[in-house]
Amino acid sequence: MSNDIYYRPTWTCGRCNAEKQATIYYNLITGISYYFEDFSAMVIGELLRVPRNGEIRMQDVSASLNISMESLSPFFTQLDQLGLVSSTPVTENIVDEYRTRVSEYNRLQQLSTPRSTQEKLPYETSNAEMLYTDKVGGITSVMFELTYNCSEKCIHCYNIGATRNDNEKSTRGNRSELTLDDYKRIIDELYEQGLIKVCLTGGDPFSKPIVWDIIEYLYNKGIAFDVYTNGQGLINKTKKLANYYPRLVGISIYSGIPEVHDYITRIKGSWDKSMNVARELSALAVPMNLKCCVMRPNVKTYYMVADIAQELGAVPQFEVSLTDSIEGDKCVSRFLRLTDDELEIVLRDDNIPLYVGKEAPNYGGQTKLMTQNPCGAGYNSFCITPEGNLIPCCAFHTVFGYLKAQDVADINHNCKELSYWRNLTLNEYEECGRHDYCAYCNLCPGNNFVEHGTPLKASENNCYMAKIRFKLAHKMMNEGYDPLNGKTLRERLSELPDYTPVRIHKEMSHNFSDIKLKING
């Protein structure tokens, strides 16, 4: 006879929309989210009514939903296999054993099952969160920039108030930040609008004293959360974080060479500390990305981060399209952005999302739809700054409202600038989408706004990357050219000249941060 009693694991959370018969359900140790529709959605909805580690009787679910036990039994067996229910009460020992199994599986998967180039490319991707959002709508995802304070001083940081050398004065903390009561109210208001997931970032979120209170509030409310951090504030606290079951932790690692990483962070010993935290999180099976911006100082060694990720069962996340500061400092594009020759080589790395090669459709080019807005921020997702400004995303600092004084729903439904943004199409942009190289642009209206004070005018950063990718793709397609010259990526990177440190400094231009959109212009 099949088991009639199950338990809801402590590592699960999710949300059911009964009206739409749609449910999202997370296994927060494996880091996998599942989307359910129709009757299966309603069954998972019954599970979510039960507190974590609470008892679930199939007979009660059967009676509540008028579904036969014969139909429920195999479904619950599948849920048990996926770690979405447990056939026994979830003790601390069971959690530890499950973490150990998942951690070992993650490492073995990375080591024994290398992904093909096609599998790595970010085309035609779909996931449970997208499916749920498409079906239900509302505000489902929000990023909280908890503070711009940080335990590192990265030379490429785009945050307002960041410095480029130790003689410059940081103004990261020059703002009146939201309080814990503010966050609880805002989270409650967002939940009423459909919230299922939050990302906690900064600066570094653990530079915010109340971060653990916010995490506990999210956990108790059943909201999945990600954390983007350098790890410095997690020393001796990784188990504490793991016990709140983050959906994902992103750790910034810039090289496999400690001195290169520390040069970028401007904090001696930061590589060792971040790596120790990453190793501990890996052992605890906390889903993890290793985040790495590729720039001149680390171009010869950035690839080592992929090796580290493989050892830890993590996913490497590389960014080659570096952006200038939100407040108009041009230092990054002036001193740190890859040269044309360096960028051509790096774009042949299939770990790079902007990869150029025959495995990608049109060698990485994608035709832009002129009748749609090229950016999805500000529809179902937003960012909230440390002082409470509601903005489209962390790269796009135009203000739709001020949450210390306004209600989320009021801004979401009544803000004229937000309505204008949501109804924009690429046809209304001045240049974007009108050139042959635009197919190779990872168009960011936020970059446009930082540079020009409007999302409608093309930014130099966007165009630079698009033109390099376009030229490389067409030389490869039409001339048989390959910047690797028959060598491996790592061989070509090793042939690049060593980086010569230079004194970098702010180069301020216009500051358009935290202003409202100009409607119709």
Where are these regions (language model features)?
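Long, charge-rich, low-complexity alpha-helical segments
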Residues: 35-142
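Alpha-helical scaffolding segments of alpha/beta enzyme cores, especially the outer helices
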Residues: 74, 185, 210-220, 236, ...
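Conserved alpha-helical substructure of the radical SAM core
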Residues: 84-86, 100-240, 244-247, 514-521
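Flexible mid-to-C-terminal extensions adjoining Fe-S/redox cofactors in radical SAM and related proteins
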Residues: 397-521
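Cys/His/Pro-rich metal-binding microdomains
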Residues: 151, 155-158, 376, 391, ...
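Acidic, low-complexity/disordered tracts enriched in E/D and polar residues
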Residues: 1-50, 73, 125, 133, ...
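Short glycine-enriched, charge-decorated loop/helix-capping segments at active-site entrances
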Residues: 29, 170-177, 263-269, 451
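Radical SAM enzyme [4Fe-4S]-AdoMet core and its adjacent flexible, acidic
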Residues: 2, 12-14, 171, 245-247, ...
